[in-house]
Regions:
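Class II aminoacyl-tRNA synthetase-like tRNA-binding/catalytic domains
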Residues: 2-242
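Flexible helix-coil linker/hinge segments at domain or subdomain boundaries
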Residues: 258-271
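Cytochrome P450 heme-thiolate monooxygenase catalytic core
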Residues: 164-166, 271-273, 333
């Protein structure tokens, strides 16, 4: 009988070991997928794709008993060779191949050139071959940024005494009303997909004081614009025993600062790949809803048409205004009108036409 203790010794070299000094001029084993092959005749550069990134290997014909023509992009392989320092290679290391074991091979040539820096193909082609297009460096980087944001959200809220919860995504009714609900039959009873975990969060605040969730929400949006999504990952938190709604704004500001710091420190490679310049969250201005409307109307000679909500153009102009005037990348808009806020938004006791809420 065998008992497992949670440890497993692998002969494959770790990424950290490949990057370190200990394996220089030593034999190492690398596993991954062949991302690209550059055949120079007697020498070929075989780029191996791993979860950490791309690693350059070098195949010299006279050093091996097989041909470069035996290798294909998309193969998964186990490579044995000697690690050398090479400043021109990605990460300053390369592995000189001595042996290659093919673990799997594509049945036919890849329909997408995933080794290119950017996938120059249609959205339809990307989705039709999604399991392949996701292997492109830029496509992978987007998922790492998503990981960074959810990781930062969890870590920051854990550090601030929050409890993570997991709420149902099928319910009898929506949390925010309206017609943008995905309706379905739940064992012959009407049901909807969750728009928001709002009511569950409020329920659990009575249990744990501070709760959060990262999970999918669904909106049956009938508009095909960049402002509308039918499904997305929502980062939600709820906290009790607050002195002011501004305490929530402070918590959100702290999270944004934490997330930007994590992205800079642990995801610099992905930011570079995507050519992303991080916004500044060090100081975020807050402006009342009615004041924001007046500022935009005056600055950009724009008439206020809807006194109860922000039009898309107004939202863009508010961002533009605070960038121009204060070099701010974020802005809080507070005190939305009671008429446009859900019933659980607290009225401002000094003027019940407005709420103690923000976006």
């Amino acid at each position: 009988m065998e008992f497992l203790d949670g440890s497993w010794k692998k002969e494959v070299s770790s990424w950290d070991a490949l990057m370190g000094e200990e394996l220089l001029n030593q034999e190492a084993i690398l596993e991954g997928a062949i991302h690209s092959i550059r055949n120079m005749g007697d020498v070929a550069f075989v780029i191996i794709r791993r979860r950490e990134g791309l690693f350059q290997t070098v195949l010299v014909n006279e050093d091996v008993d097989f041909s470069i023509h035996d290798l294909k992009e998309g193969m998964t392989v186990r490579v044995k060779g000697v690690v050398n320092k090479e400043e021109r290679a990605p990460h300053g290391r390369e592995l000189h191949i001595r042996e290659i074991q093919v673990l799997s091979s594509p049945a036919e040539p890849l329909p997408l050139a995933i080794d290119k820096w950017k996938l120059n193909t249609s959205l339809e082609a990307k989705l039709n071959y999604r399991s392949l297009s996701l292997r492109n460096i830029q496509e992978r980087a987007r998922f790492k940024i998503q990981e960074a944001l959810t990781r930062a959200f969890r870590d920051y809220l854990y550090e601030n005494g929050f409890t993570e919860i997991h709420t149902p995504k099928i319910g009898a009714r929506g949390a925010e009303g309206g017609a943008n609900l995905f309706k379905l039959s739940y064992f012959h009873k009407p049901a909807v997909l969750a728009q928001s975990p709002q009511f569950y969060k409020q329920m659990m605040v009575g249990v744990f004081d501070r709760v959060f969730e990262t999970g999918p929400v669904f909106r049956a949006e009938k508009h095909n614009t960049k402002r509308h999504l039918n499904e997305y990952t929502s980062l939600d938190f709820e906290m009790g025993y607050i002195d002011s709604f501004e305490e929530i704004m402070a918590m959100e500001t702290g999270f944004l600062q934490y997330a930007m710091k994590l992205l800079k420190e642990d995801y610099a490679k992905e930011l570079e790949i995507l050519k992303v310049e991080l916004p500044d969250a060090s100081r975020i201005p807050a402006v009342r809803f009615d004041v924001a409307k007046e500022l935009v109307a005056k600055k950009y000679n724009r008439q206020i048409r809807n006194p109860f909500d922000l039009e898309p153009e107004e939202e863009a102009l508010i961002g533009q205004y605070f960038k121009e005037e204060y070099n701010a990348d974020f802005v809080f808009v507070t005190h939305y009108p009671s008429k446009k806020r859900p019933f659980y938004a607290m009225d401002d006791p000094e003027d019940t036409r407005f709420t103690l809420s923000f976006d």
